[in-house]
Amino acid sequence: MPEFFSKNEYKYPSNPLDTPFTQSTSENGFFEYITQSSERLTVFQQHLAAKSLAWPKYLDDATFVQENLIKGAKTDGDAVFLVDVGGGAGHDLQELAQKHSDLPGKLVLQDLEGPIGEAKASKLSEKIELQEHDFFSEQPVKGNGSDINVLCVLTTPGARAYYFKSVLHDWPDDKSLEILKHLKDALEPGYSKLLINERVIPPTGAHWLSTGLDITMMALFGAKERTEEDWRQLLGLAGLKIVKIWTWEPAAESLIEAEQA
């Protein structure tokens, strides 16, 4: 990193393709690096699965799921309960399906071809539908009530919730804003919720796990962990607003509930 910052006039990196990681590997970004090798991709998915076991899971909490998601959810045959956007091989969605048998709708796992291939091989719950999707493109699961162009073809009804787990900290603000704008266009006003499972670090006195991960995100992606004010500003620029933030312990990730502003 010293060499990178010396060449970069000690400016914070903002381009995912020009970071200490890409300088040291001569690759086109971290995700392209891991997807070039099936072994790397498998190890990365195993890392995500292990990480999932280490922290509290808001979607495991029966009271949280019942009071904030199931209550008021649509129950017709085409209803989509939750979309896990960039959900990898589906570890979190599988646990949700196993621990909550009464979910009133479909579960949709979205990611790129590589992770979806891993998911197909892992025999997920029959309630989970797999969908190849790049979150830098239009969200295909969208509601009739959103402000999207009326000429768009609505492929499915809107979901009760769209879930991002450790996705946006991989991207600098401009890229995160692009992702969020696509998602905002899919939300059904007054019904759909955006759930962001990420760290919300305090402006001072942050836990060392959070600050260490902040440096890692900078080195790999030119990205960062965010404070509450960072999140409010970013979501506001995307036409979204925070409804509530849950945090169980200082070192853990938080859950941000947001909706259309």
Regions of interest found by a model, annotated:
Residues P2, T216, E259:
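Residues in well-ordered beta-strands of folded domains
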Residues V243-A261:
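Core SAM-dependent methyltransferase catalytic element
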Residues D61, T211-L213, E259:
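General N-terminal targeting signals
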Residues L69, A219, E259-Q260:
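Short alpha-helical interface elements
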Residues M1-W208, I242-V243, S254:
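Conserved adenosyl
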Residues Y191, L195-A238, V243:
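C-terminal alpha-helical "lid/dimerization" subdomain adjacent to the S-adenosyl-L-methionine
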